[in-house]
Amino acid sequence: QTSLVGSEMCIRDSGGSVLSADPALTSVTLVNTCLAAAAGGLSCAGLYKVFYGKADIMMFMNGVLGGLVGITAGADLMLPTSSIIIGFISGPVVFLSSSLLEKAELDDPVGAIPVHLFCGIWGTLAVGIFGSLASFDQFMIQLACVGITGVFCIVAGTIIVQLVKAVKGLRVTEEAEEAGLDISEHDGSLAYAQFQITSKKYHSGK
């Protein structure tokens, strides 16, 4: 559900962002956005099928989101064919980066880092490769933007995390972590009652 809402917002916002500047360009932007999303979902799901022999809806939806993120930087600058290529590459970016994070034992249960960080970097660089102003100079500008943005986010994020850690703390107790934060902090003991029963039955085979 979250992925569907996120996809709808990305498609709407990509088209809406150019509406006031050039209404005619809005249709091109929306078409490019949808093409990239479809290509990302198909390539990511297909790659998962090849490696694991089964379909995975979360990987498909993250591929869709990866395609949306990948095209966002240049949705109004691309030909439809370029949008398909960008989206199609975004799928493997999501799949491979998800696998790397899992092997590194970095916790990212919803795949936000592969979708937003890695596909964001790819999409930013793609403007210099496929965009209407594509050139070596433009690619280097895009690369510099990735570096500057990365440094800013790391510095700002570190400061914010350290402030939160000093004032309130970031870790919960082991008991709260074991029970789940929905229960320990939000009194959500009944929110997933049926899901827990179903999940236990599935894993026990009964």
For the regions a protein language model found, what residue spans apply to each?
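Single conserved hydrophobic/aromatic residue that forms the stacking wall/gate
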Residues: 1-11
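Transmembrane alpha-helical segments of multi-pass membrane transport proteins and ion-pumping complexes
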Residues: 7, 15, 36-49, 64-71, ...
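Helix-coil boundary and interhelical linker segments in multi-pass alpha-helical membrane proteins
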Residues: 16-25, 72-82, 132-133
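Structural signal for the N-terminal portions of transmembrane helices
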Residues: 25, 29, 134-151
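Structural signature of hydrophobic alpha-helical transmembrane segments
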Residues: 25-38, 79-90
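Membrane-helix interface "capping/anchor" motifs
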Residues: 48-58, 79, 101-108
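Cytoplasmic-side transmembrane-helix entry/capping segments in multi-pass membrane proteins
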Residues: 54-65, 109-115
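Extramembrane terminal tails and long inter-domain/linker segments of multi-pass membrane proteins
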Residues: 164-206
